[in-house]
Amino acid sequence: MWFWSRDPARDFPYDVTGEREELPAGWGVQKGKKKTGGDAVSVFTYEIRPGAEEQTQAAKTALKRIKTLKHPNILSYVDGLETDKCLYIVTEPVTPLGTYVKLRTDSGGVSELEISWGLHQIVKALSFLVNDGNLIHNNVCMSAVFVDRAGEWKLGGLDYMYTAGAEDTAPLKGIEMEKYNPPEKTDRSKTSKEKWSADMWCLGCLIWEVFNGPLPRPTALRSLGKIPKSLVPHYCELVGANPKVRPNPARFLQNCRSPGGFFCNSFVETNLFLEEIQIKDPAEKQTFFEQLSENLDSFPEDFCRHKILPQLLTAFEFGSAGAVVLPPLFKIGKFLNADEYQQKIIPVVVKMFSSTDRAMRIRLLQQMENFIQYLNEPTVNAQIFPHVVHGFMDTNPAIREQTVKSMLLLAPKLNENNLNMELMKHFARLQARDDQGPIRCNTTVCLGKIAPYLNPATRQRVLISAFSRATKDPFSPSRAAGVLGFAATHNFYSLTDCAGKVLPVLCGVTVDPEKNVREQAFKAIRSFLDKLETVSEDPSQLAELEKDVHTASVSPSVVGGWAGWAVTGVSSLTSKFIRTGGGAQDAAASEGASAPSTASEASKPDTAPSSSAPPAAASTAPTSYEPEEEKGAPDNSLDRWDDEDWGSLEDAEQNRGQTENDDWDTDWGHGKTQEKTVDFSSSRSKTKQVSPPPNRTSALDDGWGWDDAFQTVPPSKEHTASKSQQLEGTRPASDYNWDTSGSSGRQGDFFASLSEPSSQKNDNRNSDSAGDWGGDDNWESVEADQGLSKAEMARKKREERQKEIEAKRAERRAAKGPLKLGVRKLD
């Protein structure tokens, strides 16, 4: 029979922890948690004592009532237990309102916004009990109100509840609760009243206690104290001596919700919308989330964490809110600790990165600084970086820009392959081919800032070549960024590279058209010269100055203060220049030019400025170039870098037929075809030419360089022959006076005729004069002696070929009978 004598409390599935806080009517409340899942709860306990039968009966009534009443504003019942010795009521985790107010005193007290919403909830609970349940609470006071984790108020204390009209059956209150009784309780002459009159009087007592502290006696209700002015008229109705004047809870709620009322504020409006968010239209949800971020600063922290955040997560997962949930989501994320952030925010962020919604992607990139510290390296490399890199190839310039900027935050968490291979490959393509100058500039900026995270081999391959390419950019901020990049990463270059590779590039920038670029170049040159001079005077300092060259990882503070980093670094520099069309960049690139552009130049993609080649002297020959064309023409034999096309990707076509040994050749190594419109003063006709692939002879002109990547492709025979002809004195193809009459002919035959050795040679030219842009006489003699004769020869050959074709056609027409099956027509 031991089974029947066992204590039922031992099987209670909850552990009671924390200190017991005493409540009226013999109850006490403690914190607890479920034994199996560890869920937090609050445990209300009542010890049954002999001689307190009426109070025990009221406690049992409270247990019965709370089991059956279900309302969002009434304390939620979880579990309960009734034994001969005690009563247990398990509810959601809550704190008594009196304790909550005391805890908030140190932090400035409970705000009026919180109180307004709390009172709103209590009045709604009373309206439900009186109007829907026909019940009288009969115990509305501060000790009967509890606050949950989100700061929402719940109505409890159901010990003295009774059915409306059955006042005689109501349990008797204790002496400590008599101060909350309405005047008609003792004055039998006031028998005319409404069923809600007693509860509304108690509501007035609650309002007084919330603003002024515990109620000492009923007469204290006459003193308003700290009650807000907007609430005073409605408060006076509640504590009026005439019970008939006291409004119904629903009417009181409506009065306080009127314009200027105590319940008319953004906090209450937000809560009311969240309660009905599941039935709201998508357009209403969109507007709500857009305005929510502005109001969060004035909302309580606990409310944001436990009430708004779950709604935001639900709206993203099951709704169509989209990118508008991101700003409030990340703003609330600041209130979370690291574990909560990992549990609630990070899974949503990872899922968002796989979205194809552009607005979502750009918002994520813009807000990355808010959550990057909570992302671990495996998550970044496996789930985030593969989606982020798609932004490098997006057609929207704003997304490309934000993707570049985000690399500053992601780089420290990227693994070896993603950082040194994948990211560098995308940077290479952006810097060489992106049609937006500011994006090319920011790519250079970002490369300089993440240089400390690159491994030494990648730094040696990339930095000099990338910054050298940037100094050739037609966009002046990009050129300045290239110069500043050299200066910021000076500790990553050996003294040999400083003298042989870096300084020659910087010296070429000293004649840049932009004064700011020139000034930065001179500063950088002086810095490198001081470094070289220091080692020259004291060779023992060589090891100290080159200590970071082969260091695997260098502190990013090394490049932290480099002269403003191309105007504004990776702040919103691009927004000043990026436009919807391509003309904005052309205008920015040509800004400050002394000579006006021709119509043909305005339609061309960006071409790099030729600071190394001086403009040719004015010639008296009728076949001389326009001055604007000569100024931008590169020296083909010495510096073919300027043939690089900085225009849009659509205008640049990759050379075909070449074997690729690595991915870097795809992005950097191949020359690009470039169209140029040439004006001849004699005929004024415009002819398009296709320049051969750039013939780089300098280590500094290898794009992003990567000496192995650019030299793995063997030159073709035609390219080798063309190069040898240039060195022997043959002029570029652009110098011939092209005959427009032959434009309809076949271009292959025309170039074949040009490749034949000419019967006339210019004795005045020798191998040393190849690439000399200053010899006007040489240019004139070449065009006068060879240009016209070759054109005539080509025209004659085409005419002969045309005659042969016409003769064959005539033979076929003259032939009688049908053609044999299987015979293939040649023309």
Swiss-Prot record:
Residues 641-652, 774-783 have a biased composition (Acidic residues). SUPFAM superfamilies: ARM repeat (SSF48371), Protein kinase-like (PK-like) (SSF56112). It holds the Pfam family Pkinase. Residues 630-640, 667-678, 792-814 have a biased composition (Basic and acidic residues). HEAT repeats lie at residues 345-383, 384-422, 502-540. Residues 586-624 have a biased composition (Low complexity). Belongs to the protein kinase superfamily. This is N-terminal kinase-like protein.
